[in-house]
Amino acid sequence: PKANKLELLVDTGQLIGAIKRTSVFSNKASCLIVLRIIRDKLTVFAQDIDFSTSAEETLEVDFNGNEFSIGINGSLLLEILSCIDDGRTRLSFSEPSRAILITPENQSGNEELTYLLMPMTIP
């Protein structure tokens, strides 16, 4: 996707920690977590309706939009983030039904990393 105009910059370690802590409360089959961005705040939210549990954590981020929510598989995002050595990660969005592009803020050396993550439907 080349039309991802919304960009979020977040501390990689903080995002990994927030996903690990909240995903404990996600549905074990889907691993669905919801990323809600309002101005410069990212809320990572997970819920397991079957067991009536939920968790959320809010992080400070840089975001060039106003408000955006997207559902993703938390375990897949963790796997991608574990491969990023940079201190900050860029997530690029266009709309909640389109793929997310994930890249390190600063590409190193002569290689360029780009990860693609498909969203999930938020119930």
Predicted regions and their residues:
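DNA polymerase processivity clamps
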Residues: 3-123
